[in-house]
Amino acid sequence: MDGDSSSSSGGSGPAPGPGPEGEQRPEGEPLAPDGGSPDSTQTKAVPPEASPERSCSLHSCPLEDPSSSSGPPPTTSTLQPVGPSSPLAPAHFTYPRALQEYQGGSSLPGLGDRAALCSHGSSLSPSPAPSQRDGTWKPPAVQHHVVSVRQERAFQMPKSYSQLIAEWPVAVLMLCLAVIFLCTLAGLLGARLPDFSKPLLGFEPRDTDIGSKLVVWRALQALTGPRKLLFLSPDLELNSSSSHNTLRPAPRGSAQESAVRPRRMVEPLEDRRQENFFCGPPEKSYAKLVFMSTSSGSLWNLHAIHSMCRMEQDQIRSHTSFGALCQRTAANQCCPSWSLGNYLAVLSNRSSCLDTTQADAARTLALLRTCALYYHSGALVPSCLGPGQNKSPRCAQVPTKCSQSSAIYQLLHFLLDRDFLSPQTTDYQVPSLKYSLLFLPTPKGASLMDIYLDRLATPWGLADNYTSVTGMDLGLKQELLRHFLVQDTVYPLLALVAIFFGMALYLRSLFLTLMVLLGVLGSLLVAFFLYQVAFRMAYFPFVNLAALLLLSSVCANHTLIFFDLWRLSKSQLPSGGLAQRVGRTMHHFGYLLLVSGLTTSAAFYASYLSRLPAVRCLALFMGTAVLVHLALTLVWLPASAVLHERYLARGCARRARGRWEGSAPRRLLLALHRRLRGLRRAAAGTSRLLFQRLLPCGVIKFRYIWICWFAALAAGGAYIAGVSPRLRLPTLPPPGGQVFRPSHPFERFDAEYRQLFLFEQLPQGEGGHMPVVLVWGVLPVDTGDPLDPRSNSSLVRDPAFSASGPEAQRWLLALCHRARNQSFFDTLQEGWPTLCFVETLQRWMESPSCARLGPDLCCGHSDFPWAPQFFLHCLKMMALEQGPDGTQDLGLRFDAHGSLAALVLQFQTNFRNSPDYNQTQLFYNEVSHWLAAELGMAPPGLRRGWFTSRLELYSLQHSLSTEPAVVLGLALALAFATLLLGTWNVPLSLFSVAAVAGTVLLTVGLLVLLEWQLNTAEALFLSASVGLSVDFTVNYCISYHLCPHPDRLSRVAFSLRQTSCATAVGAAALFAAGVLMLPATVLLYRKLGIILMMVKCVSCGFASFFFQSLCCFFGPEKNCGQILWPCAHLPWDAGTGDPGGEKAGRPRPGSVGGMPGSCSEQYELQPLARRRSPSFDTSTATSKLSHRPSVLSEDLQLHDGPCCSRPPPAPASPRELLLDHQAVFSQCPALQTSSPYKQAGPSPKTRARQDSQGEEAEPLPASPEAPAHSPKAKAADPPDGFCSSASTLEGLSVSDETCLSTSEPSARVPDSVGVSPDDLDDTGQPVLERGQLNGKRDTLWLALRETVYDPSLPASHHSSLSWKGRGGPGDGSPVVLPNSQPDLPDVWLRRPSTHTSGYSS
């Protein structure tokens, strides 16, 4: 932040500055008047020895001659204007350093100097010199101390993003809240509110070939009938007068009564007793309960039979609402249930099931043994029951005692499991009845909800000592799902609490946690607005609510990383302003957030490739939410952090100090607070030990093991998921799919018990065979919205359809004959198939029934083919004769004008209706190939036919078996493309995608081992797994990419130390959130919790160990694999170009010679000596090819005493090799030592020499690094973090402390460079010279200081506490000694008295 003094017209009194502390100018310091523009006068910089004062075109501040050592320190200084050719930023004013700093005195100079800034109100230069933008270092023309001067104004427009956030955080937050509020209001008012009444909608494939045909077929069925678009009969008056009673199903029992009542006078007594006892036969539409023995024994014993009767009476019939729901007899009493005990009472002539005896059970078992053989052989069928005369010949072999009553057939067909008395167990002496079904005399549906919740929902009410209810089919699945979706909402809320509670513990701030939660909710609300209004999506499925947890998991990772970087910038810039911290933090975090957000959203958007509408809607909503969160986080998080830092952090600390003063209870609380603080410190120490030392050391040292282990896990997961046993496909169509946990009675009935009873195995009226429906006249085009399952399709007529021509008649007749010759044609189908309607027409025309409607031309006319009009006329007459009520389907569809609009021809195949995907696929492929061949020979009017069947389950299975692999592959490809665009590094992108792919493969393999079915919920979350597993890997990838070190091991350690702690905390919080969702009843919540647990934990492992181990082996070094662009300057690029080039920082050919009045010397830097600690062998990871200390070792000690006892030489010249502090703190942000063991060139000129005393190296030529903007300039103009590959974080190092000799404390190297006018070339730029240490390196004393202007201090302290007073032994800021060797990095030194850990270690 700028804390500058304001200008005043008079110089008598100090003017208050706009700084945060209200700095004032010291008394007695004169203010010079404005002298004019900077371009009015140009002066040459004169060395301090030549002139005691420097003139300025703006000011003239006399500087006292520093040669008089006895006088007081100078109180005035001369402001020096910055010319347009100066490499310094022109937006800053400079003042020269005291002259005595150029002398080699024995004491530290400048300790008592006070420099006053001359106020100034003129305009600034427009732009900096271009030489400062090329990423190279050039010494400045004049020695300057950089400060920022800001005019005093009531309002000043922010010049940068960081300044906007730092100075106006409340305004930024309010603006974001206003945008969120407006978008929420527009989203709620501009579209329909979401309707979750049918939460299972959207899980049927749509917009596929099979799905479109099914949708059109359902629409054709819905639009066919009386008073509809199409008619089965061409008579208009008949269709218009037909009432809805024609389509209304007959009342229960009416069909049976109409067929039975005329025969009741001759029926036996047993049959009349059964009809009087039960209210007809059991039906599928009744509610059902499944009983099993508690002791795993047989249910065919008297105790179990009586137990079932009592449980029904106590739990169901005693409920108050049962009487209003049950079917009633003629006596207005509730009908008895169809249970094993009641059938036993009927066959034994008992009044109730509780009156039956053991003898009755034994007698009935013997009768069942006899009749079971005929039932399983197919002889005992409903048509054989009763004493009627019109029975099929095969009924004659059935004994009368088995067929005279329907009780035996109903017991075997409806109530007893298929294994009881099956052909394999008929000879058992004591057959075992494992399961028995009970039919309640109430229809299935929502009316049973109260009975279920009051009596059947609790498990302890469904069991006694003999039997228990383990399965139910009450028709309540949809209704109960809506109930539990609301009731189980507590589990996702607990998961959210776990995520944000872990975040609060990590951030140690409730305010920040609430702001993050508010940011997540705001992102979702804005995404809802875009989803509803911008994208105009009509359907908002219930699964979109899962985006709250998914986005919270992504946000948790970003938040932890951000505040780690925020704390790090605070520790590295303790005196820097908030604008500096925001700029430095967002330089790294903005890059990471951009790459992570784009990669995650691209992975979610890839799921749009799915054909399930619910999955596509979630992909669109979740991808949009991630992008909105990306945009919002760029301003929301830093503004929240600034707000907390400015108004809450310091105020809370002050209130906390004053709150503990008081009585004994408060002292007790203080003791507790101290204990908790001690625990927190212990946890922090453990965290530093684990993530700063052990984890990097373990990853690098055992990288061989990690690569092999995780590669084997990924390969095993791929084998399990793709080869054996694989993910099982669903066995039920979407409406009956699994929605509750597997142990729920509803799910157990559908998954286990439904197939155990023979009446459920075969669909009614169709014999269990797959039908084939051939359609002509309607195109298979789904005109509905593929993203809205509620939208219905309309029928698209085929304009070329014609079935009345002679060629069409011949082809249709031949199609019937050829179909009968196919192997899949069922020859035992009942009645004539409508496929052969031409044969049916021929037989009708030759039959006597043709004349029922009166004399007609059709009767007796056998000339084939007929004329088109005659053919259509006879078809209409046949339809009227055989279906006078308009309900019999002959395969003909007429429109309102009586014309033939469509043909719907059906026949039955010998393929069984099975949930087996392979068998259904064989049926579909065989029929498709046959029909394609037939249509190829069809006349033009019949070539656009198509077929469908009972393929709802197959359509879902086909989509789930093919789409997840495609979606995951596309998601990985998009992730790779996004990472490549973000890093421009091919190896890093490949390694990241490999880690993400390994995460997905291992996760799917684990889900297979958990016996997951690849159902709709699983497909939903598998499509999101790539998006969930990206962020941890991106954390490490970006941190590795932004690391300033060129060697891969240092970069691996750097990235692990920087992000591993936040990554582990985020994974632990999400694991806890997943565990809290496991008790939920709704399967969606449970599986979302499992996915969160598995994906995040597996992703953390693959990112931390597999990805980093790959980088240890094959990670890019320097520019390896980097797609270079003109604006991308890597931190290790300086000085590595062509040696003969005119690159900044390289010595020019004529600059070595001395200039007039100067005695230039050359210095050369040697690698700094390092000393191993005793724990080196156990605490570092070393290379087998060298004995250099590991980059992970922090045990190398920094010495305050002399490293060498060689006497120090006196400086040869006042102008020594100096360092510009801008180059120090911008080019290489991390602490690093120059290593003689690693050189970039293919033929290094120097080699390390090792002996038993330590490590030495040959001298290396040095070259200064390129300068950049100073920290002050960064606050006003943030660096472009997307063009620069170097991180702005300073002090993040994996190397160890180094030391130079401290034998000569007076031989210091100044911070900035002063250049005489003779050293300037023709263009006014300084001429660079190569420096040499002349073999005196061991006696060089490095006392470099950081040049920072602290606006938080009063102006009177600036001269003593700015660049002079700061940077002492206690200052933790690092210093840099540039290396003249272009292939080697600079020498970075840590302050002597600090030994930091964590990121700065």
From Swiss-Prot:
Gene that this polypeptide is encoded by: DISP2
Membrane topology category: Multi-pass membrane protein
Cellular component terms per the entry's GO annotation: membrane; plasma membrane
Biological process according to GO: smoothened signaling pathway
Low complexity bias locations: 1259-1270, 1352-1362
Positions where Omega-N-methylarginine occurs in the chain: 1366
Subcellular location per the Swiss-Prot or TrEMBL entry: Membrane
Ranges annotated as biased composition (Polar residues): 1175-1184, 1284-1305
Membrane spanning stretches: 170-190, 484-504, 510-530, 542-562, 589-609, 617-637, 704-724, 964-984, 990-1010, 1019-1039, 1064-1084, 1088-1108
Keywords: Glycoprotein, Membrane, Methylation, Transmembrane, Transmembrane helix
InterPro entries: Dispatched_Hh_regulator (IPR052081), SSD (IPR000731)
Similarity section: Belongs to the dispatched family.
Designated name of the protein: Protein dispatched homolog 2
Domain of life: Eukaryota
Record has Transmembrane helix as a keyword: yes
Segments for region (Disordered): 1-91, 113-138, 241-264, 1169-1192, 1229-1337, 1352-1401
SUPFAM superfamilies noted in UniProt: Multidrug efflux transporter AcrB transmembrane domain
Domain SSD stretches: 471-643
Organism: Homo sapiens
Glycosylation sites: 239, 349, 465
